[in-house]
Amino acid sequence: HRPQFLAVAAVAVELAPDDPHALIQESRLLFGLGRVKEAFKVAEKARQRAPKDAVVNATWGFLQLARNRNGEAMAAFEDAIAQDSTRGEPHLGLGIALFQRNRTDAAVEEMRKATLLEPSVSLYNSYLGKAYYEVKQDRQAEKYLALAKQLDPLDPTPHFYDAIRRQSVNRPVEAVRDLQKSIELNDNRAVYRSRLLLDEDLAARDATLGRIYNEVGFEQLGL
């Protein structure tokens, strides 16, 4: 339904071309469809009109991450946090940016803050689970990925991350089930295409599934 939502957002911008909230909604939907250059241009307009808006700056931060501009992304997320301390999204973004700089402890802490501020958001719990997996805290990783699955049964993200985690702890059959589930749910993703541009791409799922099938012994199904 994202193209339809984008059409509605475009009409809203036509009706109120100087409204930063209409602009940033259009930008986020464009970003969700993978149209990053267009999203960036629209977000620039929103930022010119509302440079101190937390949603505008958080979106700007994710767009900077997509353009591999880590420093600018971090600055945008820090601005967004200062402008609205109740939102989890900029903490998630800052956590991703910190991971890119190998500042893993600080990254985990930011992602933890996102889940504390908005505990019912599945996506934040997915990324916190993945963060704990990256720092080899498997029990915590398992806990938050399980919670993410409960919070949003239609989100493929926690199943994808849990497949990788389960394979790493020698539970390949369960890993296959999780990865198949993530592929089945793939078309139900919302908000961002490839979930903030990390590694949610369907091709990545297929490649991971092939490797896991091979390790389980289903070579004929592997890549």
Range-by-range predicted roles:
Residues 32-33, 66-67, 100-101, 134-135, ...:
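Register position in tetratricopeptide repeats
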Residues 15, 49, 83, 116-118, ...:
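Structural marker of alpha-solenoid helical repeat scaffolds
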Residues 20-21, 54-55, 88-89, 122-123, ...:
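Helix-start (N-cap) detector for alpha-helical repeat units in TPR-like alpha-solenoids
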Residues 2, 36, 70, 104, ...:
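TPR-repeat structural position
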